[in-house]
Amino acid sequence: MLKTKSSIILFILFFLACLLFFFKPLLYHFHSEKILAPDQMQSLVDNASQSLLANDVPVGAILIYNDSILSTGINTVYRDSNAGGHAEINAISNAIHKIGFEAFSKLDKQKLMLVSSFEPCMMCRGAIIEYNIRKVYFLKGKGLLHWWKNDLKQVRYEWSKVKVNGDEVQDSLFMLHPKYKSQ
């Protein structure tokens, strides 16, 4: 009897984990929608339009701090031949250029939000996570199939990466940096 109950519980937990894995890209549907101020929406549309005028994918992003636009970004991948020239990354970079890295690092991240006209890709998500931007909003989401394909790419990456020898070389370079803190 006890074995049957624990098997049922394990099955239910496994089933819930599978549901979470397969539908995690759609979790934003469970949050309420954010209403942008008219000037913020206009800035977002203007930035996406600028990308389009440069023959780039029409995506714009704004970084908002304390309800004011801190910086904007447009998609510049084709215009600048820059693989990292996504609107979200450009908005983050422009904010850092505007106020400096130290000041950006000290911003209250609870008052900082990134808004994009299109759901951020994996690369932009990485930048969002790296810079501890906790609030992310977007106008149009990507489909479930898109994220499933990305999950497969992530698995392929994890299986294909190989560490090479030379830890001490990178460690010595880190130690030369004035802000390096040994771990």
Regions picked out by a protein language model, each given a short descriptive name:
Residues 2-52, 110, 120, 126-183:
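Zinc-dependent deaminase
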Residues 70-77:
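Short beta->alpha transition motifs characteristic of CBS
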Residues 77-90:
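A short, polar/charged loop-to-alpha-helix boundary motif
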Residues 82, 92-106:
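A contiguous binding-surface segment within folded domains or other stable secondary-structure elements
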